[in-house]
Amino acid sequence: MLIYACLLFAALMLVLTKVPVAWAQQRTGRYDNHDPRAQQRELTGFGARALAAHQNTIEAFPLFAAGVLVSVITAPGAPIATTLAVIFVLVRLGYWGCYLANIATLRSLLWGAGYLVSLTLMAMPLWM
């Protein structure tokens, strides 16, 4: 049930990608837990990239989760679905790393790959 582990890990990435954001906020003097979004709007450089990567992780998760659920319902146990889920997780980890390291072109390519993986998972009923 590796596909479920990928879904769980993708959900955990919603929290993991917040860690560098919180670190960047802390570096400004203190983490403002009363109004963290206002503090986040002030981030620049690494902090701004970390925030953008975190926000995109939140945006990418629902499409991936829907794709996994569609594939599990329509093609239970299909090896291609599991392979695609693993690829998604690896691509998103690479995307996150590229965003933090400011490697824009590769980051964009990885974003596109992750998006295509999610769409492919959702489209599986069309050929399975």
Regions of interest found by a model, annotated:
Residues 78-88:
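Structural signature of hydrophobic alpha-helical transmembrane segments
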Residues 93-116:
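Interfacial loop-to-transmembrane junctions
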Residues 1-20:
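Long, highly hydrophobic alpha-helical transmembrane signal-anchor segments
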Residues 9-12, 86-90, 109, 116:
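Hydrophobic residues within alpha-helical transmembrane segments
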Residues 121-128:
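Juxtamembrane boundary at the C-terminal end of a transmembrane helix
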Residues 22-30, 76, 104, 127:
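Transmembrane helix-loop junctions in multipass membrane proteins, especially transporters and channels
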Residues 22-52:
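Cytosolic, membrane-interface loops and tails of multi-pass inner-membrane proteins
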Residues 13, 55-69:
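Core segments of transmembrane alpha-helices
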